[in-house]
């Protein structure tokens, strides 16, 4: 992800240190790796880290592997949310953020509802990282362009990686 400051065109690369982060559809293999990476970083971490999915068994497994207690010992408030069992996932996730939305949102499934939820929970200068590569060349999802213009929200895609990425993730 990246962030900006109003009046400046300089991009601050990476998640917002001490910010609010959400990982949607985040308990598959790549999501588990992401949770591990976020919880073990020494240089930068969110204060709030919300991980969602619609599969309770997978959420339970993630919560066993990466406990709230371990996250708390690292200064991170970790929450697991089954968005398939709440009436309004966007409202629930925004409430968890304290109503401000999230600084960094990662969408880990090429599913229209996931991407649209990601867009709808962004806070000011929020970055949506579309990590999951769709195979459908016609894949689309709605985006609030009012928020892009007036709220400085932005979307980026992540695909592949390089040797430096692998070395960093293994540290």
Per-region residue spans from a language model:
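A generic alpha-to-beta junction signature in SAM-dependent methyltransferases
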Residues: 15, 42-43, 97, 121-123
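Glycine- and other small-residue-rich loops at beta-strand/loop junctions that grip anionic moieties
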Residues: 23-27, 51-52, 81-83, 103-108, ...
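Short, well-ordered alpha-helical microsegments
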Residues: 31, 59, 114-116, 166
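C-terminal hydrophobic helical "lid"/dimerization subdomain
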Residues: 70, 86-92, 116-120, 124, ...
